[in-house]
C-alpha cells in the first residue's frame, strides 16, 4: 500500500501496491503552499513514510497536544473558548522524510527534516474546510476519513507529496 497527496488537487489517494486506486479523500494542505523549511508553515514535498501512528482507540474528535491526548473532545464550545488553537484531532500519522538534504536531515539552507517539523496527517474539526489549502503545514483530513485510513495503513507506508 502507498499514499499519494496532491497539493494541487487537495486529495490524498490510497493506492494498492500495483498502483490501483483504493480510495481518495479530500484534504487540506498548507495555506502557505509547499516548502521544506522549519517555521515556514508549508507542506513538505517528496517521498515520505509513516513513521508513527498515534491515537489508536481514541474517540473521534479527541484533542491532541504534542502528540498526546489531552482528555478533551472537540466541540464548537471548546473551539470558541480557544479561538487561536490549531486543532489536531482523532488520530495522527507522523511523517518522516526519505530524501536526505531535501526533506530529511539538513540541506545547504539548514534543517529540512519533515519529522523534526512535526508534520502529520491528522484529523480536523468538521467545520474545517477540505479541498483547499488551510493548514499550518500538516495534511488535514475529516475525522471519519482518517479513522478509516488509519486502520488500513501500517507504519512505514510510503507517502508521496507532490505539487501536481
Each language-model region and where it sits:
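N-terminal post-signal-peptidase region of extra-cytosolic proteins
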Residues: 1, 26-40, 72-79
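A structural motif detector for short, solvent-exposed N-terminal "entry" segments of globular domains
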Residues: 1-33
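Soluble periplasmic/extracytoplasmic beta-strand elements of cell-envelope proteins
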Residues: 4, 13, 49, 92-94, ...
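Extracytoplasmic
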Residues: 7-9, 22, 45, 88-90, ...
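Short, solvent-exposed loop/turn elements at domain surfaces
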Residues: 14, 35-36, 58-61
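Well-ordered beta-strand positions in beta-sheet-rich domains
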Residues: 24-26, 47, 118, 158
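Short, surface-exposed secondary-structure junctions/capping segments
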Residues: 34-53
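Exported/periplasmic cell-wall-interacting domains
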Residues: 58-164
Amino acid at each position: 500500500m502507498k499514499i499519494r497527496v496532491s497539493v494541487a488537487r487537495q486529495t490524498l489517494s490510497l493506492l494498492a501496491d500495483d498502483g490501483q486506486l483504493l480510495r481518495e479523500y479530500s484534504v487540506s494542505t498548507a495555506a502557505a503552499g509547499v516548502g521544506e523549511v522549519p517555521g515556514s508553515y508549508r507542506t513538505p514535498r517528496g517521498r515520505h513514510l509513516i513513521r508513527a501512528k498515534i491515537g489508536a482507540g481514541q474517540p473521534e474528535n479527541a484533542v491532541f497536544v504534542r502528540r498526546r491526548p489531552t482528555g478533551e473532545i472537540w466541540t464548537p464550545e471548546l473551539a470558541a473558548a480557544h479561538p487561536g488553537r490549531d486543532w489536531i484531532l482523532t488520530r495522527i500519522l507522523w511523517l518522516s522524510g526519505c530524501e536526505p538534504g531535501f526533506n530529511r536531515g539538513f540541506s545547504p539552507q539548514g534543517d529540512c527534516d519533515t519529522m523534526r517539523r512535526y508534520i502529520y496527517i491528522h484529523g480536523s474539526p468538521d467545520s474545517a474546510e477540505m479541498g483547499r489549502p488551510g493548514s499550518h503545514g500538516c495534511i488535514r483530513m475529516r475525522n471519519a476519513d482518517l479513522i478509516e485510513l488509519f486502520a488500513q495503513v501500517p507504519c512505514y507506508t510510503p507517502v508521496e507529496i507532490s505539487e501536481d
